[in-house]
């Protein structure tokens, strides 16, 4: 693989980030909007940063950070539904995608060859 842009998990997490930003456009709570969009942006950003470090151990570390951000994002999506800041159907779709991305990240971590 020549570039992080070729990773399916990066592509999907980037699309999810865009979806989260769109879902939060009308959000009246600026603090919530800022926190959830930061979590969403953290996923593809950490995948890219880890890949560009050119070190297996660094890549794994950043993939784990991205995986943690998936959990943070899912939590914020659930809370956004419950407090009425996010449309349930849109947020549920994002929750499902974040869970799949988390699984993909773990699979990638498990498949990376040793140094």
Question: What are the residue ranges of the model-derived segments?
Answer:
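Amphipathic alpha-helical assembly/interaction segments
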Residues: 1-115
């Amino acid at each position: 693989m020549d570039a992080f842009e070729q990773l399916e998990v990066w592509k999907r997490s980037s699309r999810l980030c865009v979806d989260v930003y769109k879902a939060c456009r009308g959000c009246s709570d600026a603090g919530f909007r800022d926190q959830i969009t930061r979590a969403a942006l953290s996923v593809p950003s950490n995948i890219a940063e880890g890949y560009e470090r050119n070190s297996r151990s660094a890549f794994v570390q950043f993939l784990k950070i991205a995986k943690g951000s998936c959990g943070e994002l899912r939590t914020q999506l659930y809370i956004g539904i419950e407090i009425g800041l996010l449309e349930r159907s849109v947020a549920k779709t994002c929750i499902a995608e974040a869970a799949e991305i988390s699984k993909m990240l773990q699979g990638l971590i498990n498949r990376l060859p040793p140094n």
